[in-house]
């Protein structure tokens, strides 16, 4: 059934990036053990039960709520298609209670960012992972866009990034600071012969491919462990951290939106954390205004 879905018009209508992610998620889901001697893929589609789905979902939860829910969502697409084809009476994944994902407020400190990057850049195997996280932080962009970033988006002459975001198709044009520019030039010297800015450092079948989201998570965790950083930190928190830093610096909302690609101030709310520094800056500006008018 999964093979049928992967050749269906519904799947082929997805963007290439989504196709790669869906295929990877489905392949991993099929390998999930249902029992000691049986993998999920060994069960005939008509025989998949709610109990089977609950077992594999609990296994996915060990890798995190986000990953578990994402996998369940993608697999449900296949089950829904099977239901439409009358191969299943109903989608068994619908009856699996999903873990609630709390709104994340986690942020990196500047010291933690530096420690992560120093650790990642210290070993060749983590070089591209370090660059992906570095760009996500400096550009305030999503990790997904950075792992798939192509050299055509980087203009070394004008020192800028020109990107069409994958989620909302927003266009952003961002200057590249000196430290990141130096890393990009070094990366281009070694990997400029192919299209991706931060590909897997070891080619497969002589092809350099981008990391998928799960590999990024695994390798980021490796770097964090080596650096002694808290487990709660994730690469996706870099975007929130960067946006919050701009808020604390007193950058105008419209200017932040020009960097982040948000289409309204309301859509920025999940990324903004109320901090002491923000309050301090706000009250300092109010006091300054009061002194001016008194």
Locate each region found by the language model:
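Conserved tyrosine-mediated DNA breakage-rejoining catalytic core shared by Y-recombinases
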Residues: 112, 139-141, 148-189
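Short, basic (Lys/Arg/His-rich) helix/loop patches that form interaction surfaces
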Residues: 118-129, 139, 174, 189-196, ...
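Catalytic-site neighborhood detector that most strongly recognizes the C-terminal catalytic loop/helix
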Residues: 107, 165-169, 260-285
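C-terminal secondary-structure termini that scaffold catalytic or DNA-interacting sites
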Residues: 200-206, 286-294
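C-terminal catalytic core of Y-nucleophile DNA break-rejoin enzymes
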Residues: 166-186, 194-222
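Short, polar N-cap/turn motifs at the start of nucleic acid-interacting alpha helices
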Residues: 153-160, 230, 251-272
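Basic, Lys/Arg- and aromatic-enriched nucleic-acid-binding interface segment
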Residues: 69-71, 84, 88-143, 147, ...
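Basic/aromatic-enriched alpha-helical hairpins
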Residues: 3-62, 78
């Amino acid at each position: 059934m999964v093979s049928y879905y992967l050749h269906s018009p519904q799947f082929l209508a997805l963007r290439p990036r989504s196709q790669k992610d869906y295929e990877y998620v489905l392949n991993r889901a099929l390998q999930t053990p249902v029992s000691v001697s049986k993998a999920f893929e060994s069960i005939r589609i008509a025989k998949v039960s709610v109990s089977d789905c609950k077992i594999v979902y609990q296994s996915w939860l060990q890798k995190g709520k986000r990953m578990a829910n994402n996998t369940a969502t993608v697999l449900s697409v296949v089950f829904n298609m099977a239901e439409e084809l009358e191969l299943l009476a109903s989608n068994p994944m619908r009856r699996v209670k999903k873990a609630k994902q709390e709104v994340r407020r986690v942020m990196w400190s500047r010291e933690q960012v530096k420690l992560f990057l120093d650790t990642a850049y210290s070993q060749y195997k983590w070089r591209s992972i370090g660059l992906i996280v570095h760009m996500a932080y400096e550009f305030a962009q999503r990790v997904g866009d950075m792992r798939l970033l192509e050299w055509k988006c980087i203009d070394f002459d004008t020192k800028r990034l020109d990107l069409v975001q994958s989620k909302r198709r927003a266009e952003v044009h961002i200057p590249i600071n000196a430290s990141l520019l130096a890393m990009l030039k070094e990366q281009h010297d070694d990997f400029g012969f192919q299209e991706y800015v931060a590909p897997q450092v070891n080619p497969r079948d002589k092809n350099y491919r981008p990391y998928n989201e799960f590999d990024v998570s695994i390798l980021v965790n490796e770097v964090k462990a080596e650096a002694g950083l808290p487990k709660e930190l994730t690469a996706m928190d870099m975007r929130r951290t960067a946006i919050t830093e701009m808020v604390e610096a007193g950058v105008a909302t419209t200017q932040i939106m020009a960097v982040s690609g948000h289409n309204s101030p309301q859509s920025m709310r999940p990324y903004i954390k109320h901090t002491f520094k923000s309050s301090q800056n706000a009250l300092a500006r109010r006091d300054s205004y009061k002194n001016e008018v008194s």
